[in-house]
UniProtKB/Swiss-Prot annotation:
Belongs to the glycerol-1-phosphate dehydrogenase family. Pfam families: Fe-ADH_2. PANTHER family: GLYCEROL DEHYDROGENASE, GLYCEROL DEHYDROGENASE 1. Keywords: Cytoplasm, Lipid biosynthesis, Lipid metabolism, Metal-binding, NAD, NADP, Nickel, Oxidoreductase, Phospholipid biosynthesis, Phospholipid metabolism. It comes from Bacillus licheniformis (strain ATCC 14580 / DSM 13 / JCM 2505 / CCUG 7422 / NBRC 12200 / NCIMB 9375 / NCTC 10341 / NRRL NRS-1264 / Gibson 46). GO terms for molecular function: glycerol-1-phosphate dehydrogenase (NAD+) activity; glycerol-1-phosphate dehydrogenase (NADP+) activity; metal ion binding. Catalyzes the NAD(P)H-dependent reduction of dihydroxyacetonephosphate (DHAP or glycerone phosphate) to glycerol 1-phosphate (G1P). The G1P thus generated is probably used for the synthesis of phosphoglycerolipids in Gram-positive bacterial species. This is Glycerol-1-phosphate dehydrogenase [NAD(P)+]. GO terms for biological process: glycerophospholipid metabolic process; phospholipid biosynthetic process. It catalyses: sn-glycerol 1-phosphate + NAD(+) = dihydroxyacetone phosphate + NADH + H(+); sn-glycerol 1-phosphate + NADP(+) = dihydroxyacetone phosphate + NADPH + H(+). Substrate binds at D145, D192, H276. It is found in: Cytoplasm. The keyword NAD applies.
Amino acid sequence: MNDLISYVKKTLGACECGTVHHPLTVEKIAIGDNAVEQELPAFVKSASYKKAAVIYDETTGRLAGKRIASLLEETAETVPVLLEANEAGDVTADEQTLVSALIGVPIDADVLIAAGAGTIHDIVRFCAYQRGIPFISVPTAPSVDGFTSAGAPLILKGKKQTVQTTAPIALFADLELLCQAPQNMVAAGFGDMLGKVTSLADWEISRLLAGEPYCPAASRLTREALDQCLDRKDDIAAKMRDGIEKLMESLILSGLVMLVLDHSRPASGGEHHLSHYLEMKALENNKRQVLHGAKVGCSAIMLTDIYRSLIGASLGDQHAEQAIRSVYEKLPDGKKMAEWMRRIGGPVSFKELDVEEELVREALAYAHQLRDRYTGLKIINQYGLLPGLLGKGPGVKGVKM
């Protein structure tokens, strides 16, 4: 995976699945030691950008934002845009923050630079889309797979919604900086990738039972990204250079696949719906946010056991029962996934995240309504299996939260 852009173009360009594949608009990806220092100024100069708004929060400003401004001193004028935290201490991609960021970007800026992790990138990609100018990605932690995608999960009127905006024109990932990321941020990135276990199964189920568009090549690329993380989990856990490089490559590859498809289907299923629901509830109650990848990882660990427990369930629909067996019997069990996540230093249950059991039950009942997607999460509600899962009625076995 030395040249991710060419690899994705070649693999998906040869695909004959019949679904729409969009052009890959990311021009450059640089992952390596001193990638920002050595390659960002040259890229800005070659593109003839004159005025860059560098967007960051208090923490990422110290880590990268101010350094970027210094690096570009002789190349372009830079304007800092500091994102403020809310009362709970989080920077969130809600209306207030989005408008504040847009106001902070000078009208004559011709490029934006996102210096941060997932939320900052979502805010910047929205601003770039609204202003009609490109943005450059400078990740400060290997924590999410959305760096190179066009989808921006935003909080609009208190509800989590993914808005298709724009992908970065380029990404520069400094391995020295990424290796210094806190362990919980690294574990969050691994958790976001672990979510592909259930999201890929959900995509296949939706193909079989709901006739949703499906691309085998995109599924295969996402699976490769997941497998690469699993193969290097010990190196990732130790934050070794090669391990962090492979984690970052995997996150970027997943994002590029989403970009070409113009949707997040291979990377986001029931586990993301649960995560988004819990995030919305935290905002409602003015609570500090839990890292996205931590919630996704815990959701995937729980859902894989739920999905496996559906095998053999009597649904009164032979086709659905056969599809469930063919897809879900290939899933690893939650105990094995928890071992992987624990090795990286991440949480394996919602109890560890201080999420109340009753809220998890509520999420299992309602999170599938957030997106019009067919998932195993929707199946358990469609066929009335949730009470049995929660030990409150007949049906499949209970599940550990």
